[in-house]
């Protein structure tokens, strides 16, 4: 039985006997051509669309966010992409940046279009350290996801060192939970916790002071109890009492004193953040 599917204008048949013979001569192979139609496909590299080149490390600059208010939104988006947070809260935090610290720095790349504003590719925040006038605490370090692993993080940290050293600071502190080896390659070592100063002024705002409970009023000192042993009433004389037995010796075993400073491991830490996640405190002299 012959089954023929007729299509117009060409005829399509599935009968093997009616199939055309294909010659095996290589010189008689059918010729395949691409007929350009409404949409033309070409593999010519000269006609391919140009990809946006990655920014050059040499062209990066570091600028405070409060000096470029037009980039505030872009900086907030960059940080929220790593640590999601209310946009209003993030903008408020960035708006606190000032030359008196805390200070937010942006790593900027020139836009491919010369007339456009630069692109925010990184961010870090610097805060003063309590009781350490020559130290700064580095926080909220982030680089755009598409540019990670290409040297932008190192460029950002090196720029922070230059920025801090030019203003008289000699040590940087930071915390991390998964980038210990990255900071170790930059010269950081494990350190002790420090407290960053949130306010730019040494005096706390009055609104904050009013939030604390007032100190209790002083109470008159209590009279110390008289511990002087009073003489017992004398009774009839008798034989003297025997002396009391000696007190037993206190058997305490003190722990051995370590011969040197406690060893610190890059894999273990005793510190945790507010969420209970282990963190490493690191520091570097600059």
Swiss-Prot record:
Any one GO MF annotation of this record: protein-N-terminal amino-acid acetyltransferase activity
Stretches assigned to the N-acetyltransferase domain: 60-207
Enzyme category, top tier: transferase
Main location: cytoplasm
Cellular component, GO annotation: cytoplasm; cytosol
Pfam families cross-referenced by the UniProt entry: Acetyltransf_1
Sorted UniProt keywords: Acyltransferase, Cytoplasm, Deafness, Disease variant, Transferase, Tumor suppressor
Biological process annotations from GO: actin modification; N-terminal peptidyl-aspartic acid acetylation; N-terminal peptidyl-glutamic acid acetylation; protein acetylation; regulation of actin polymerization or depolymerization
Enzyme Commission identifier(s): 2.3.1.-
Family indicated by similarity: Belongs to the acetyltransferase family.
Entry protein name: N-alpha-acetyltransferase 80
Organism annotation: Homo sapiens
